């Protein structure tokens, strides 16, 4: 505890004292799992640029992508321990804060405008305080995106086509339950392991936003791309209280402002990538088909029912999120 207090005071003094000490910079490590050129990569780079500008160079964000600092689960553990300062988790948040499983509900989020309303009315007043109690400082909501299914066996037109398919999913229990209810054989796996699993046939397929599919080069080892849009996954800028809380209040505010002001860039870039990458994946040899979304929605009822009963206030959160989709 004394060592932690001393480190915090040293950081504080380096930012506030005049002279040479003031010239020192604070470096914060941000880890994420996205490949170069992914939405995660572009978003984190934009955020780092904004932090440097806002703090006049006093704070520098060092970005480590492609799981260099660990997979999603490891990054959250390291953030809590203070060995990584910032992370960009998505689905995995539901494994440490069950209420974040709200965003594992199929077809809950209609579009980015709907997500903005959910962010304002549910994420900040309800989910963020729970995350804080669990030891995570949520600075902003960004995006992973609308998820699609790829595989090597057949086009996925409806839930029945998933029966028996070995499908990689991220580490979140509701995604596993969802695909089990569709008849697939899902296995949770870190993103950095997926390419080899697909290449060797350990997994038949996976599901991800187009940005992750393309930049992870899954088109090189997958034949079919089925446009299901089954889940929209946000991403969260999460800070370690051990480091973040030791910074001066003004600096903390600047960092959080930079994170939140990056959100429009994230949404605009994500939308553009969705448009651009579909054609690139098709030209790369993938066979693309539209899925029967109504059939998937009908098959998703058990997941909603389970979340409503297992997670405190789960039913109320679902109802509120759905109502926000109609502009209420």
What is each residue range found by the language model?
Residues 17-23:
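Sec/Tat signal peptide C-region and signal peptidase I cleavage site
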């Amino acid at each position: 505890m004394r060592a932690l207090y001393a480190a915090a005071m040293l950081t504080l003094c380096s930012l506030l004292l005049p002279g040479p000490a003031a010239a020192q910079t604070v470096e914060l490590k941000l880890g994420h799992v996205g490949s170069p050129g992914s939405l995660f990569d572009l978003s984190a780079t934009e955020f780092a640029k904004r932090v440097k500008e806002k703090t006049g160079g006093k704070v520098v964000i060092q970005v480590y992508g492609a799981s260099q600092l660990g997979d999603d689960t490891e990054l959250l553990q390291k953030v809590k321990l203070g060995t990584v300062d910032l992370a960009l988790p998505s689905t995995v948040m539901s494994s440490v804060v069950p209420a974040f499983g709200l965003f594992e509900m199929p077809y809950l989020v209609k579009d980015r405008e709907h997500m903005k309303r959910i962010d304002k009315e549910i994420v900040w007043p309800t989910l963020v305080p729970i995350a804080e109690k669990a030891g995570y400082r949520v600075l902003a909501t960004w995006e992973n995106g609308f998820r699609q299914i790829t595989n090597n066996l057949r086009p996925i037109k409806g839930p029945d086509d998933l029966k028996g398919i070995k499908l990689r999913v991220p580490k979140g229990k509701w995604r596993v339950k969802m695909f089990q209810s569709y008849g697939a054989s899902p296995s949770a796996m870190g993103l950095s392991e997926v390419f080899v699993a697909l290449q060797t046939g350990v997994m038949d397929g996976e599901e991800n936003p187009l940005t992750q599919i393309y930049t992870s080069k899954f088109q090189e080892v997958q034949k079919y791309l089925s446009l299901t849009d089954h889940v929209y996954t946000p991403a969260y800028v999460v800070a370690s209280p051990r480091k973040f809380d030791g910074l001066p209040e003004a600096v903390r505010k600047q960092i959080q402002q930079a994170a939140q002001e990056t959100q429009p860039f994230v949404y605009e870039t994500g939308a553009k990538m969705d448009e651009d990458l579909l054609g690139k994946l098709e030209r790369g040899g993938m066979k693309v088909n539209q899925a029967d979304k109504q059939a998937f929605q009908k098959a998703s009822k058990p997941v909603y029912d389970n979340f409503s009963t297992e997670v405190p206030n789960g039913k109320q959160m679902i109802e509120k999120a759905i109502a926000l989709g109609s502009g209420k």
